[in-house]
Amino acid sequence: DYTCPQNYAAYTSADHETYSRLYKRQSALLPGLACDEFIAALPSLGLSERIPRFEDINSTLFKATGWEVVAVPGLIPEVPFFTLLANRKFPVTDWIRKPEEFDYIVEPALSNVPVWLLELVLSPGFPDHLQAYGAGGLKAHRLGACEQLSRLYWYTIEFGLMRQRGGIRAYGAGILSSAGELTYGVKSAEPQRTMLVVLR
């Protein structure tokens, strides 16, 4: 299933510093840019500026949602990914971004673990939605429809925006973990923001 242990002892002081810098910067940027549910969930897991231990996070996360984070070595194939989601396990690479990747990275690295964890506790329906998405992904794979499901995932869970009373707000993990994407996606007049119509 591609999961592996989190080798916490392997993290260097530079890794902890990178994580701390990212955590502090993103925490300061979130008010007014992140959705209300995300802001409300911030204190729920007691995350800090230190690299989190998965077992510590999971003890809280599992009680709240029935989910847990599992370490994987990198991007994994569709079937193992969807299987993990269907079993309420979210795969996260256990490595820290390099300084040159500080503002954006393609893979769900440990650097945006807080984002994913908070996504899972945003609302009572989200944990079940993500599990159903995993089950749906397995069905889509059998039907040869993974491309469509991947697109939906990309524009919602990864880069989703929503309209709230205060205006456009971010809820996608890829946006919330990147300073540039967060400000651009929510505040800039340049992006073309299209209302999601699932059947389109």
Range-by-range predicted roles:
Residues D1-V121:
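The feature captures two recurrent sequence modes
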Residues S59-K63, W116, Q131-A135, R151-L161:
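Short, hydrophobic/amphipathic alpha-helical patches that form generic packing surfaces
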Residues A64-V72, P124, G136-A140, F159-R163:
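Short secondary-structure junctions and interdomain/linker hinges
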Residues L117, V121-P124, L196-R200:
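Short, intrinsically disordered, charge-balanced linker/junction segments flanking boundaries
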Residues F126-C146:
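A long, hydrophobic alpha-helical segment
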Residues A140-A173, S177-G180:
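Extended, Lys/Arg-enriched charged tracts that mediate electrostatic binding to polyanionic substrates
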Residues A173-R200:
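C-terminal structured domains
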